[in-house]
């Protein structure tokens, strides 16, 4: 008998569980043959607090087949967690080095969905740097989906980190 599946979807910076990608993933998991459980937490804290919360979610579901899906900054977090827990991860236009985007990230930003204001500090960028995992210990755990026309993220950084694989 196979174990139940659990999917942890991590949205991007200033996004939400209400995003189109998150909602499509929820819909897919709910109607798939395996009827995977899915969790799409709202990521609204700094990096250290976010990782602490995500570790708790993973630890609660350890008896299940866990997979990660991360988009943008959620892809960065999924990379860290995949390496830490040796879990498969699908990354959608992942942020690869978000700590290098100091000028565009520092300061206050309005969430697209909730209108909540998020403040990004130097400490947050330093926390992101501490989460960097290179080189990857388990590169075969990743399936990376890239779009070349992303206005914010340079897909070439993801190709450099994860390699080019034709699937």
Model-derived features: where do they sit?
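Short hydrophobic segments within beta-strands
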Residues: 9-13, 69, 145-147
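Short glycine-/acidic-enriched loop or helix-start segments at secondary-structure transitions
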Residues: 19-20, 77-80, 101, 154-156
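Aromatic pocket-lining residues of Rossmann-like dinucleotide-binding sites
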Residues: 81-85
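The alpha/beta-hydrolase serine catalytic core
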Residues: 88-167
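Gly/Ala-rich beta-loop-alpha elbow adjacent to hydrolase catalytic centers
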Residues: 68-78
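Short acidic/histidine-rich motifs immediately flanking catalytic phosphotransfer sites
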Residues: 62-67
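Active-site catalytic motif of lipid deacylating hydrolases and related acyltransferases
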Residues: 3-61
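Short, flexible hinge/linker loops that cap or flank conserved catalytic cores
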Residues: 1-2, 136
């Amino acid at each position: 008998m196979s174990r139940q599946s659990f999917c942890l979807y991590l949205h991007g910076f200033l996004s939400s569980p209400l995003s189109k990608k998150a909602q499509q993933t929820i819909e897919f998991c709910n109607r798939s043959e395996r009827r995977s459980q899915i969790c799409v937490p709202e990521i609204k804290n700094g990096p250290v607090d976010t990782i602490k919360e995500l570790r708790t979610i993973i630890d609660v579901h350890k008896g299940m087949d866990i997979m990660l899906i991360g988009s943008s900054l959620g892809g960065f977090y999924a990379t860290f967690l995949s390496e830490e827990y040796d879990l498969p991860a699908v990354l959608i236009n992942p942020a690869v080095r978000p700590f290098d985007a100091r000028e565009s990230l520092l300061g206050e930003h309005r969430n697209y969905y909730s209108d909540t204001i998020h403040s990004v500090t130097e400490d947050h960028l330093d926390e992101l740097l501490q989460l960097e995992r290179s080189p990857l210990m388990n590169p075969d755990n990743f399936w990376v989906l890239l779009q070349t026309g992303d206005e914010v993220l340079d897909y070439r950084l993801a190709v450099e980190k994860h390699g080019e694989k034709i699937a």
